[in-house]
Amino acid sequence: MLIGVGTDIVQILRIEKILHLYPELFAKRILASKELRQFALLNKTSHATFLAKRFAAKEAVSKAFGIGIGQGINFKDITILNDDLGKPIVEVSASYTKKYSSFNIHLSLSDDYPVCVAFAIVESSC
């Protein structure tokens, strides 16, 4: 059963400007610990796109749950990883998953400088 659909678009240029002002603070604000480890391994030229995609993905997932970031879920409650083929995998913190019995999250990410887009579908697995 469909729980919700969410989408978000982010200007990569906007993230570049934020990174110029706050090089480490922004990443620490929106990335979960596993994502921060990935981020640290990236070439600096990839930082803005990586952060823009994670920001858009987390916004899209929160919208698919029918809420927004800061309305019962925050950036660090959602972790975006990739499988061996690059497919995005979404992990939601245990504190949030207690609100839903079981669900599947489908996420698609795309970027074409200067924008990136995320599209999320949350469905009940019951």
UniProtKB/Swiss-Prot annotation:
Broad class of where this protein is predominantly found: cytoplasm
Cell compartment(s), UniProt: Cytoplasm
Family matches, as InterPro entries: 4-PPantetheinyl_Trfase_dom, 4-PPantetheinyl_Trfase_dom_sf, ACPS, Ppantetheine-prot_Trfase_dom
Catalyzed reaction equations: apo-[ACP] + CoA = holo-[ACP] + adenosine 3',5'-bisphosphate + H(+)
UniProt-listed SUPFAM superfamilies: 4'-phosphopantetheinyl transferase
GO cellular component, one term: cytoplasm
Sorted UniProt keywords: Cytoplasm, Fatty acid biosynthesis, Fatty acid metabolism, Lipid biosynthesis, Lipid metabolism, Magnesium, Metal-binding, Transferase
Record-linked HAMAP family: AcpS (MF_00101)
Protein name: Holo-[acyl-carrier-protein] synthase
Organism of derivation: Rickettsia akari (strain Hartford)
Gene (name only): acpS
